[in-house]
């Protein structure tokens, strides 16, 4: 956990050719500076990936060691207000300590599943009480996964609210999400092997969700 941001840095550079502290548009730099000052946080490390898939994501421990990564697709597909809305969403994750919160929360189902596996690793030597504990742990594991999904969705809503609050432009975020959804769908098939669109764990939108958006629109 302590070294995970540094490992992610290496993965981003090695597989996605991310460039950190790369020059970003002046309007975006000014926007990030303003949000950081208003929320008492350090200016994050900004990563840039030369990938046509529009995406952005945040990782790190706290708001003071956050990394925000954006792709070329974000800057090309969205207008200035929409780019600020997307980056505002990612800054919201950092301000609310979402990276740390979700990492700790996700340890619960891992622990419960570990208990279940221990209790059923050797059925011949397990007592009835051990098996009962294992069954209870597995049920709690299943329930905890749904709770994690709910928590994750709640954090996303909070990040959306933060973005709207700092940009004063709810339409920009809504339009950006639609454009990102369509952009991920149209670029997915032509993407190279190591494209950020292939990772659903990272990003403001995953490619599977974007396909649903296109079908519904």
Give names to the regions the model predicted.
Residues 38-65, 163-217:
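Active-site-proximal gating segments in proteases and membrane effectors
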Residues 1-55, 106-150, 181-185:
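Hydrophobic or amphipathic, alpha-helical segments that drive membrane association/targeting
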Residues 32-36, 152-169:
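An active-site-proximal "capping" alpha-helix that borders the catalytic cofactor pocket
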Residues 9, 32, 70, 89, ...:
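Divalent metal-coordination and catalytic microenvironments
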Residues 56-80:
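Active-site scaffold of zinc-dependent metalloenzymes
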Residues 91-110, 170-171:
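Catalytic Zn2+-binding segment of zinc metalloproteases
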Residues 69, 79-95, 100:
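Short alpha-helix carrying the canonical HExxH Zn2+-binding catalytic motif
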Residues 27, 82, 103, 154, ...:
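Alpha-helix N-cap and coil->helix boundary residues
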